């Protein structure tokens, strides 16, 4: 009960959803496991990592995916298993291991913010291979269905708002829209808030204070952030991505 919601790089898996007392919300970020290497290693593909020493965290999907990938490629590797993220990074940057593997978003973050001087971010590259599906989603305690619904539909509201062109700058103007879907989303036509047990202005408040999904993505991890991650699979379905919200109706 110390934490109401965990929003981290936590992958939604069957066993986590069924056996650990969690319920997961909507997928907030479609990630995948990648590899960070120093440029001086001279490799441009994960398929060139035969015999490499790899830093990885224990008890994670990352550790299992790593073994599966190397086995599937008929390559060998030497794992350096370290529990704390800070210690993994220190081991990698000190040269104790050739490769650091985790979710690609984590690798972008590490490269942007954790490279110790005199080294620079440009001294390290993220290899092109993504070797797993890592759908990241917020986790809540199993058994509180209303709260789980609120968490889930808050994400959907941000996606639906982006799809319909509602953002933090125009949300007040959008209150005047005659589009029936926009009127439902913003609570001008009441009922959706009541169904969730929240104020009818719940979506308006999210968008006004936080922005739609695209705004949040760009600000925190996208081109408006130090990470500069391309949206990729996290584009809306209308733009070739996987992000898609059920109708708010």
Each model region followed by its residue ranges:
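Conserved C-terminal helix/tail region of periplasmic/extracytoplasmic solute-binding proteins
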Residues: 219-249
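Acidic, polar ligand-binding/catalytic clefts
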Residues: 1-48, 105-132, 244-247
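Extended ligand-binding regions for polar small-molecule ligands
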Residues: 38-43, 47, 52-53, 58-61, ...
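Extracytoplasmic small-molecule ligand-binding "clamshell" domains
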Residues: 1-9, 196, 209, 213, ...
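Sec/Tat-exported extracytoplasmic proteins
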Residues: 2, 7-10, 14, 39, ...
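Ligand-binding cleft/hinge of the Venus flytrap
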Residues: 24, 62-83, 112-119, 156, ...
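Short, hydrophobic alpha-helical packing/hinge segments within bilobed ligand-binding/sensory domains
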Residues: 85-91, 97, 106-107
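Bilobed "Venus flytrap"/periplasmic-binding protein-like clamshell domains
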Residues: 11-12, 30-90
């Amino acid at each position: 009960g110390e934490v109401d919601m965990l929003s981290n790089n936590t992958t939604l898996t069957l066993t986590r959803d069924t056996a650990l007392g969690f319920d997961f919300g909507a997928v907030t970020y479609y990630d995948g496991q990648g590899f960070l290497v120093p440029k001086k290693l001279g490799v441009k593909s994960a398929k060139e990592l035969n015999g490499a020493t790899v830093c990885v965290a224990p008890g994670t999907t990352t550790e299992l995916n790593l073994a599966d990938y190397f086995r599937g490629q008929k390559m060998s590797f030497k794992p350096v298993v370290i529990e704390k993220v800070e210690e993994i990074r220190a081991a990698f940057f000190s040269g104790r291991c050739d490769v650091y593997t985790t979710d690609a978003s984590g690798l972008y973050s590490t490269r942007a913010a954790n490279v110790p001087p005199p080294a620079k971010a440009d001294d390290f590259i993220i290899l092109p291979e993504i070797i797993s599906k890592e759908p990241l989603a917020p986790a809540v305690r199993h058994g509180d269905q209303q709260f789980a619904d609120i968490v889930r539909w808050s994400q959907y509201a941000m996606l639906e708002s982006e799809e319909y062109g509602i953002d933090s700058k125009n949300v007040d103007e959008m209150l005047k829209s005659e589009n029936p879907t926009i009127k439902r989303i913003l609570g001008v036509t009441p009922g959706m808030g009541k169904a969730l047990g929240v104020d009818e202005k719940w979506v308006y408040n999210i968008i006004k204070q936080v922005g739609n999904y695209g705004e949040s993505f760009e600000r925190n991890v996208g081109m408006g952030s130090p990470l500069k991650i391309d949206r990729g699979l996290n584009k809306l379905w209308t733009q070739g991505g996987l992000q898609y919200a059920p109708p708010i109706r």
